[in-house]
Amino acid sequence: AERPSLYDMENQLSEMKVQTLIVVGDEDDHCLQPGLFLKRTISASGLLVLPKTGHTLNLEEPDHFNRFVSDFFSMVEHGRWLDRDPRSTPSEIMKTE
């Protein structure tokens, strides 16, 4: 079976309500754009870009990675990881009244 493109799943992803932490390394060129796409598409998501890391950022910077993931879990557990403020979307930011 052919694997669908991530971008073809935008509607399904936009319906996700689970808290999501998207983590990419700033030197992982192939994952930066998909990471931004996921951040824009999943309302309860956050994007963490670790500097000077590639695709294996959990191995390259394990202390940083573990700290951020632990903080994410703590925020979710304590109800502090909220959906994105709808006013922050590009269509809302560019509105003129």
What is the role of each PLM region?
Residues 15-16, 22-24:
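Short beta-strand/loop motif that positions the catalytic acidic residue
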Residues 8-9, 34, 49:
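Hydrophobic alpha-helical segments typical of transmembrane helices
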Residues 1-12, 18:
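Active-site nucleophile elbow and catalytic-triad environment of alpha/beta-hydrolase enzymes
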Residues 29-35:
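Conserved alpha/beta-hydrolase "acid-adjacent" motif
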Residues 45-97:
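Catalytic active-site module of serine/aspartate enzymes centered on a nucleophile-bearing elbow/loop
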Residues 10, 36-37, 63:
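Active-site phosphate/pyrophosphate- and oxyanion-stabilizing loops and adjacent acidic/basic residues
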